[in-house]
Amino acid sequence: MNITNCTTEASMAIRPKTITEKMLICMTLVVITTLTTLLNLAVIMAIGTTKKLHQPANYLICSLAVTDLLVAVLVMPLSIIYIVMDRWKLGYFLCEVWLSVDMTCCTCSILHLCVIALDRYWAITNAIEYARKRTAKRAALMILTVWTISIFISMPPLFWRSHRRLSPPPSQCTIQHDHVIYTIYSTLGAFYIPLTLILILYYRIYHAAKSLYQKRGSSRHLSNRSTDSQNSFASCKLTQTFCVSDFSTSDPTTEFEKFHASIRIPPFDNDLDHPGERQQISSTRERKAARILGLILGAFILSWLPFFIKELIVGLSIYTVSSEVADFLTWLGYVNSLINPLLYTSFNEDFKLAFKKLIRCRE
């Protein structure tokens, strides 16, 4: 995203970059762009070619990968040209298109993380009922909603820019506006509200999972002296869930959900007969789940929070930042599109197998 307040040419004046600096910056950004493109393409191809991954939850991840791929293909390359050349030389129309695509795709990527968290929350806390509702149509509706909200958040500047008497300097390509209300509206809608919702959802997911781990431990202890079929029935009964295997295994929250798919317990499993051992296993799983959630939330917050803090303080005329700082924070946000395909697939064995198949085919 490239949003800034109106500034004078003097205030925008910066020290020209040396050839060496431009080369280093260009190489770094090209590597980021290339990796982002390849990783998101790999996710899309893995889901498209692997029947086992054709699940509603994975459709959300695929849509996220498509959105991040658009950031890598349509947004990052023009940003590299703009940064390296220190000025915009591609014309007013292309500038307008680039800024609109930038804001829409980045906002959409953030909102995808929100609906993925919501999908996982429902899958954990309302498993039986949501398993019936978790369909491809529902996933498509969630994706359509995300894109609609993103467009409503990012498009308003187009209308007032088209009515401005003075066009922005041809050497600049930034959204120049003095609309404080829009600054608040866009930052709240694109980041702060989704961030709040994501934090609440993952907090509740963790506590729900922790409770379910404890119930699973209790059900195992009570069913150790039953037959295998009796164990399966009793465990399902005690956990108030059902024995299924169609939960999405692509989620990093798989550690939370997978006990639904593996309720069957070997008879006379004396290894788990001691409360201390059961508690240790439960504690290990809780720590692993906490680490996964910490990675997801940490990557998202570290990538986008600095940018949106800058947007508020600059948009509200509290403080101004140099173009170098603005570019760095913008690309820090773009890096989230590189991290997403790693975080949302690397904890799942089905995705790992699909990636291995893709690599073997290329070899």
UniProtKB/Swiss-Prot annotation:
Keywords, A to Z? Cell membrane, Disulfide bond, G-protein coupled receptor, Glycoprotein, Membrane, Receptor, Transducer, Transmembrane, Transmembrane helix
Any one cellular component term from GO for this entry? synapse
A single MF term (Gene Ontology): Gi/o-coupled serotonin receptor activity
Annotated glycosylation sites = N2, N5
* Extracellular-facing ranges: 1-21, 85-92, 158-179, 317-322
Chain location of the short sequence motif NPxxY motif per the record: 340-344
GO biological process terms on file: adenylate cyclase-inhibiting G protein-coupled receptor signaling pathway; adenylate cyclase-inhibiting serotonin receptor signaling pathway; chemical synaptic transmission; G protein-coupled receptor signaling pathway, coupled to cyclic nucleotide second messenger
Q: What domain of life does the UniProt record list for this protein's source? A: Eukaryota
The disulfide bridges present are C95-C173
The portions of this protein that span the membrane are 22-45, 60-84, 93-118, 139-157, 180-203, 292-316, 323-345
Q: How does it sit in the membrane?
A: Multi-pass membrane protein
Q: Where in the cell is it found?
A: Cell membrane
Q: Identify the SUPFAM superfamilies for this entry.
A: Family A G protein-coupled receptor-like (SSF81321)
Name the residue ranges of motif: DRY motif: 119-121
CDD domains per the UniProt record, alphabetical:
7tmA_5-HT1E (cd15335)
The residues the record assigns to binding serotonin are: D102, C106
| Keyword Transmembrane attributed | yes
**Which Pfam families did the record assign?**
7tm_1 (PF00001)
Topological domain ranges for the Cytoplasmic compartment = 46-59, 119-138, 204-291, 346-363
Q: Which family does it belong to?
A: Belongs to the G-protein coupled receptor 1 family.
Task: State the protein's name.
Answer: 5-hydroxytryptamine receptor 1E
